[in-house]
């Protein structure tokens, strides 16, 4: 979605909300309305705002420093600049997980020290709260200068960056109370700790209907069959690893289980370094040969990039050779827009002139995936023995991938006061995408002023939400072990041959009817 946090609040002069569907005017995504930000255009003055606070529990400390300055640009222009710096400490609102409390109560010592589980806080073994936001820097500018009485050149843009980090769920080692119920889910992390049901006397897997006890998964490093299949769990509460089998696995260099190296389990920490940049340049004014036509022609380019990281996790298929921190890659969306908009009025015999707005837009989109480090997507030697591949929690992208699409749109919008009490609007927009074809959307809206204090409003509109270049065209395939066989899994292009076999895919569409009554706001 749109990241409104990239625009500092001091850069905003006013926010307008169009609550009716607006795909017929603004295109994809404007199904339920539009937010229009009017930027500050002061050519003088300085404003400084600082904020500091924290939560009652003592965490969540945050500060913000923001400043805005306006200055003249020549004799008939302005340059307005806003900067903001913010830091937000994460919060933790977790309680002790039932499975961890159960393990502690039943004598599984490794989880008693919560710092062994959660590297972020030693208070609870599960991170739950708002993420950390560090080095949140935002810069924004807005400018314009008059060339003559009817023409103005303008430009605005921004650069924002920040690092965000949060936590995932706890990876359970030995299970919970359900261990005592045959056939029930143990709650152990699959692909890391959860082993097959095993014979408690041999540690070897039993058939699904042959009983057995839960176990902790064991891998055979040379791919042979010299190791047991799992360390049986039993004892008090059904969560105690059998000490003799655990010693046997530990003593054999060819056998490996993550209970040896990470006996308390773990909580991955996931985040990203985000950058958002955009610039728009345009010219607006009135045509000077008596037509009364106002115009606005512009070009805009923007990009958003995220480079991900994940730490305090593993690639289980690599066994003891796994790193604990990974760089799984990144992604970037880049868009370029060319707009031409025109407005004029004509006398059509109504109570007011008929306002005619029309225009065209050409959009280019590009989406790029950047490959992660090799360990973040590797299929290690233990993958065929039930250990999951890729960095646990967020697997890395295996290769650089790019996708693109473009679209061309035309629209017309008519509005007039038909009588002194009735206002009507009609709009239609056609947009043609290189990836899936064209779509036409319309809007009919009106206002009836019943009294000075009561108005009846209504709108009938159609809308759509087109897939982005990344959603429509990206390929990201990883290899996993499913039921003992190597299987490719991932995301395929929306219009690939395989996707076409599954269903006929079109952009999401809508029909919106919005009747309402309104009264003037009392100020």
Language-model regions, residue ranges each:
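Outer-membrane beta-barrel transmembrane domain signature of Gram-negative proteins
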Residues: 268, 272-274, 279, 288, ...
